[in-house]
Amino acid sequence: MVLIFGKENCPYTAAARADYARRDVDVEYIDVKQSRAYMEQMLGYSSGHRRVPVIVEDGKVTIGFGGT
């Protein structure tokens, strides 16, 4: 499963979600604006970087999304 931390109004988050959906990858989407705990969880993965999306796939963390 892939974790995507993002914000609903972020076009890069939307693009990442669409890309994984197109490839039929199981994704858990977490909107960091919904809870301080979600934001803290994202910051833990991203070493404090506040840029979204933060994608966690097979233990690898990617900050941002540039498409495929």
Give, region by region, the residue ranges found by the protein language model:
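Thioredoxin-like thiol-disulfide oxidoreductase module
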Residues: 31-49
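Local sequence-structure signature of Cys/Sec-based thiol-disulfide redox active-site neighborhoods
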Residues: 1-27
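Accessory recognition modules or surfaces
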Residues: 7, 12, 41-42, 48, ...
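Non-catalytic, surface beta->alpha helical segment in thiol-disulfide oxidoreductase systems
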Residues: 57-68
